[in-house]
Amino acid sequence: ECADVYKECWYPEKPCCKDRACQCSLGMNCKCKATLGDIF
C-alpha cells in the first residue's frame, strides 16, 4: 500500500506512490509532496 499525493506517509509501512518525496514537519506530520507531473 502506498500513500497518494498530499496524504500521510511513513516508512517503511506506507511510502508515497510513484516515488514521491515524503516530507515531514518537525518529524511528526509526514505528507507526500507533489511532483511536477502532478502540477501540470
UniProtKB/Swiss-Prot annotation:
Keyword field: Disulfide bond, Knottin, Neurotoxin, Secreted, Toxin
GO MF annotation list: ion channel inhibitor activity; toxin activity
Cellular localization per UniProt: Secreted
Signal peptide residues on this chain, from the entry's feature table: none
Similarity comment: family membership: Belongs to the neurotoxin 02 (plectoxin) family. 01 (Tx3) subfamily.
Record remark: domains: The presence of a 'disulfide through disulfide knot' structurally defines this protein as a knottin.
Official protein name in the record: U2-ctenitoxin-Pr1a
